[in-house]
């Protein structure tokens, strides 16, 4: 038994010395971006699309599209992008088409990329807001309580820590806004 323990110790010591041998550096190669993902980026080209008379959608400015519905005297906006900066850019385009005041803002759901640009679209008017009854609760919770963990997870999920040239798109839009 004693000699068996010595043999095990000796084998462990030999293993330790062998594992401390000179190491080689492995070269890291940049992973290839799949062609389908590159082609998918074409879906998010920045453009203003006229869907039909009086209905326009801004695509590629944020994760969520923003829609203008023209009225005779007032306009309706569906989803307001994820930041004031992007909302300003989209609003300026919409105003070039029809500068009527925004009477109504509709949120399709309570995510930041659909709601955080609302103050820009509401400027100069007091629009009615149409949303699910829980939208205010969820937005308040995200802003006040969950923001650190949501931000951390979103940044990791959408690749915000990667260099810009390594991010092709975010699957549902060009990039995640941090608004």
Which residue stretches match the model-derived regions?
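Active-site HxH/HxHxD metal-binding segment of metal-dependent hydrolases
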Residues: 92-179
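Short acidic, Pro/Gly- and aromatic-enriched capping/linker segments at domain boundaries
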Residues: 38-50, 177-178
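Sec-dependent signal peptide recognition
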Residues: 6-13
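Bacterial lipoprotein signal-peptidase II cleavage site
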Residues: 21-26
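N-terminal secretory signal peptides that target proteins for export/translocation
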Residues: 1-5
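C-terminal motif of bacterial Sec signal peptides marking the signal peptidase cleavage site
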Residues: 16-19
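Conserved beta-strand hairpin/beta-sheet module of binuclear metal-dependent hydrolase folds
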Residues: 45-96
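Short glycine- and acidic-rich boundary segments immediately preceding or forming the N-terminal edge
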Residues: 28-42
